[in-house]
Amino acid sequence: MTELHHLTVTAAQAALAAGDITAVELTEACLARINATEPTIRAFLHLTPDAALAAARAADERRQQGRSLGPLDGIPIAIKDVICTDGVPTTAGSRILAGFRPPYNATVIERLVAAGAVLVGKLNCDEFAMGSSTENSAYQITTNPWDPTRVPGGSSGGSAAAVAAGQVPATLGTDTGGSIRQPAALCGISGLKPTYGRVSRYGLIAYGSSLDQIGPMAWTVADLAVLLNVIAGHDPRDGTSAPIDTPDYTTALTGDIRGLRIGIPREYFVEGMEPGVESATRTAIEVLRDLGAILVDVSLPHTRYALPTYYIIAPAEASANLARFDGVRYGFRAEGETMWEQIEQTRGQGFGPEVRRRIMLGTYALSAGYYDAYYRRAQQVRTLIKRDFEQVFTQVDLLAAPTSPTVAFPIGQKINDPLAMYLSDVCTLPINLAGVPALVVPCGFSEGLPVGLQLIGRPFDEATLLRVGDAYQRLTEWHTQRPRLVV
């Protein structure tokens, strides 16, 4: 059998059902792997080993009694630290939330617990999910398991690195502008950004409220389908949660994609894309043709405006959302002679430079005299970007494109160049602006580092994305590759 810490969710599920392993053995293997690799990877901000082992023992007891809760019962999972967990530190990677323990669980956590998942801890991320490298965390820099001198991507870098390093078989991340998909690509795993509204945001610490979405990260598309079955669905506590039925996503994994029309958007093969990335992506697209799909060249003409549009709308929403953090009721608090001085010092010291930068950008865009020139105009362009997708989906069933223009870059290379960092999400931002779903699967290597193929779908049609991604993984072996970590 594969080493326990390298099992996929579906493989672990089968081994548990067959009695080949116990949930306690699987959890202990993951905890041992975490202890061995954390000095190098630094994916976790907080571990809950005692609670995890207690949950694993409960899962084993249920299984012995014939009361298993389903495919996630006894499976270790870790959570990005922007998702609230009752009584467990939740910092959003920020000093301003140091020591904060939420008094409730996010809806996705409630659903995972109800499904028997074993939660082992909270994962590092860029502060308030603002970043593309996980270098913006106030606590530590997570490294890429394929090359620890390089970034894992961001902002869900801890979530991607934890899977790639074999610390846990699956994680939850969040995606506001590519924060599930880009790190999944850079770490050689699979990741899904669901349609906006498919997964509840209740209990998610907000960055961009019209853009944020929680999603699963794991080795295989089959694993993602199992996780999405659990976390998706309407939640009356989230006003943006879509009141529509959720299918059984595992039934979509038929392996047959014959006749599907897949669009290849020319605008996503951007100038400056590394040749190895483009080559791996185009080779992967040809595999889809070999599987019987029909490839169609398409255009999304307003893609070139996505980057400036995003960096007006997202900071504007962040400016409003982060106004609540003042040190008065919870988290970090600085000293000051007056209330206003205390708030100013708390926010100045509690927020890192990238968060402060985006708050200032957003406040400027929303200010009197600039609202119409920037924010309102950005919303108008966002509508044009949405219409591009609506129009192209009358011609094709889904799109296939690169995820990132580069492979994982060296730690420190872009952290002092915000524009260069922002450009790393040029292939992912438009999807968030349109609110449509997107899936990333590993599709090869360039200079020894992973490359990811991005599949983009119609709103609420995650099933087709999963069907195509699963068919691709049945014919290829990129998702079976594991980094050679020296521990």
Swiss-Prot record:
PROSITE patterns: AMIDASES
Active-site residues from the entry: K80, S155, S179
A Gene Ontology BP annotation from the UniProt entry: translation
GO CC annotations on file: glutamyl-tRNA(Gln) amidotransferase complex
Broad enzyme group: ligase
Keywords: ATP-binding, Ligase, Nucleotide-binding, Protein biosynthesis
Known EC number: 6.3.5.7
Sample GO molecular function, one term: glutaminyl-tRNA synthase (glutamine-hydrolyzing) activity
InterPro entries for this protein: Amidase, Amidase_CS, Amidase_dom, AS_sf, GatA
Reactions listed under catalytic activity: L-glutamyl-tRNA(Gln) + L-glutamine + ATP + H2O = L-glutaminyl-tRNA(Gln) + L-glutamate + ADP + phosphate + H(+)
UniProt xrefs under SUPFAM superfamilies: Amidase signature (AS) enzymes
Protein family according to the UniProt entry: Belongs to the amidase family. GatA subfamily.
Subunit structure: Heterotrimer of A, B and C subunits.
Its job: Allows the formation of correctly charged Gln-tRNA(Gln) through the transamidation of misacylated Glu-tRNA(Gln) in organisms which lack glutaminyl-tRNA synthetase. The reaction takes place in the presence of glutamine and ATP through an activated gamma-phospho-Glu-tRNA(Gln).
This protein's name: Glutamyl-tRNA(Gln) amidotransferase subunit A
Species of origin: Chloroflexus aurantiacus (strain ATCC 29366 / DSM 635 / J-10-fl)
The gene coding this protein: gatA
